[in-house]
Amino acid sequence: MGEYLTLPMEVYSGILVTHEGVFHGDLIVEEMAFEESRVEKDDFVISPTFFNAHTHLGDAALREAPRLDLVSIVGPGGYKHRMLSQIDSKTLRQEVELEVRISRDAGTSHFLDFREGGKAGLEIVKGIDGVLPLARPTSVEEAEEVEAFGFAYSSARDHDLKLMEEVREIARRRKMLFAIHAGEKDCADVDAALALEPDFVVHMNSCPEKIREFVEAEIPIVSCIRSNAFFGLLNKKSYELLSEYEKWMLGTDNAMISTASMLDEMHFAAYLIGKEKAILRAATASYAVFGFRHGYVVFNRNCSFRRTSDPLLTLVRRAGVKDIERVLIL
């Protein structure tokens, strides 16, 4: 008896779940568009794909990191840099590709990846679908020449301020992003970060009193909540403030600590701070902030969504790869 091949559907009828509401209609695969309907349809649950606004994907070669403090793990000369220096570039690339494939299968389409290691570090992720590399130049000359989506630095306390100011200007001239970490451990590096007028800043968990200044300047802020938890730096007050900000985004930070899947990040965030609607917005806001179009994730109703009273809550709190029928990425 022959085997039967089930071809993917070209239309998925159901509900589209976004932070703006729930809509009945049809997802037309060929057009990558959702068409609303006046008729209630609920065969599938559909959501936008997710955008990971902060990763260090090369760290995937170091699964799992030991329980040390922030500086000992990721600071200059710390565990991460010592261990990565012992791994060849081919292995690093293979681990990045694996982490990206796993996360894309879970609905995360794009990754803003903070790259270390100069041009060699950029080569590790070159050509990997969905990875948007942000370089960390160590000289003005390197910043002028490097081909990347933008530039990104760790804490202002780790780098020469004059160099970062010059790279910031180069980013403007070359129409590239400029990003920086700030407020992860304390407030000491926040004013310097703010003065650089970055296109977005990562963390701010330990400095809630300065969040308003970034909001008033309309500078997007990325939270990496599982990473904060790992380092003992959770601050619910900061996340609650950020949940009210339309330019709040989510990332996953170091792949040696957390998976790069935004489903996993949303699950953790939901149980820590609630505000599931804001969390879903933060997992998809980066498309608009950085000028990309989202795709769609089609979930079946066989498991998590089977008898749900609220599909948005199920999506943010518990939906997993077992529930995914198809991921459509532009």
Curated annotation (Swiss-Prot):
Keyword hit for Cytoplasm: no
First-tier enzyme category under EC: hydrolase
Entry keyword set: Hydrolase, Metal-binding, Zinc
EC identifiers of the protein: 3.-.-.-
InterPro entries: Metal_Hydrolase (IPR032466)
One example GO MF annotation: metal ion binding
Record CDD domains: archeal_chlorohydrolases
Top-level taxon in the UniProt lineage: Archaea
Family: Belongs to the metallo-dependent hydrolases superfamily. ATZ/TRZ family.
Protein name per UniProt: Putative aminohydrolase AF_1775
Protein's organism: Archaeoglobus fulgidus (strain ATCC 49558 / DSM 4304 / JCM 9628 / NBRC 100126 / VC-16)
